[in-house]
């Protein structure tokens, strides 16, 4: 079968959750609701952190960046899916597909890095509270966040350029609701060995760094918490990181099942469902997890609402 270079093909087709467009119509309302809740919730977290000077700390600086990443992450995939359902089309241009792939990989890895950075912040807060301000200086916080953005932008660009170098067969149907890397590789007519090798090396390395940071940080955190004599002290210390731990478990538990398995063993339906969990559900739940379990966020939300009530006509 003769392959065509990616740049010579005008479009491909996102099959979504079903090849029949009529079967996807009931999903429109659900995904629109989840998208609006996700964007509104994460932007509200950012607004609260910016407006309340008491939240101008390293922990909330990282949380604001995580909320920004979540809002951008869900905006990379869901709007195109909603537009396709609304206009009864499955088409996406190849340039649009590559652009979606770039931003998807950027924000999914950025979220992983930010969660690892927040785990380190939690470790310093619990294990070295007296030196917290000295260690988590503004310069270090800005460096960690900036490095996460820059490294993942370059990492995503590498994968996008490698994808652009492949040739594709006559079948341009992607069994997914967005342009993910593994479904695209499965359509290639040329040997994607280089792409898969880069995925294995860079994905494995970055994943290992993030996971090791999480494991080492939380091992020390739990060890320190267990040494606290009072039950109240243990609860207070654990509450500092419980929200973050919940988000970490949900995000990594679903994303690892999809991104670090061989393309030959992938089930399109299972991948699609799992991808919904970490591309839509997790970004939607993050603001609720952090706001419901965090007294400072709840207090700032109440103050923000109260101030707006006072100034409203």
Swiss-Prot record:
BP GO terms, sorted: adenylate cyclase-activating G protein-coupled receptor signaling pathway; signal transduction
Topology class, membrane: Multi-pass membrane protein
Cellular component aspect of the GO annotation: plasma membrane
Matching InterPro entries: GPCR_Rhodpsn, GPCR_Rhodpsn_7TM, Olfact_rcpt
Record: glycosylation sites: 5
Extracellular side of membrane: 1-25, 80-100, 159-196, 260-272
Localization (cell): Cell membrane
Regions of this protein lying in the Cytoplasmic compartment: 50-57, 121-140, 220-236, 293-313
Disulfide bonds: 97-189
A GO MF label: G protein-coupled olfactory receptor activity
Entry keyword set: Cell membrane, Disulfide bond, G-protein coupled receptor, Glycoprotein, Membrane, Olfaction, Receptor, Sensory transduction, Transducer, Transmembrane, Transmembrane helix
Residues passing through the membrane, by range: 26-49, 58-79, 101-120, 141-158, 197-219, 237-259, 273-292
Known function: Odorant receptor.
Family (UniProt): Belongs to the G-protein coupled receptor 1 family.
PANTHER family: OLFACTORY RECEPTOR
Name of the protein this chain belongs to: Olfactory receptor 1G1
Organism: Homo sapiens
Higher taxonomy: Eukaryota, Metazoa, Chordata, Craniata, Vertebrata
Gene: OR1G1
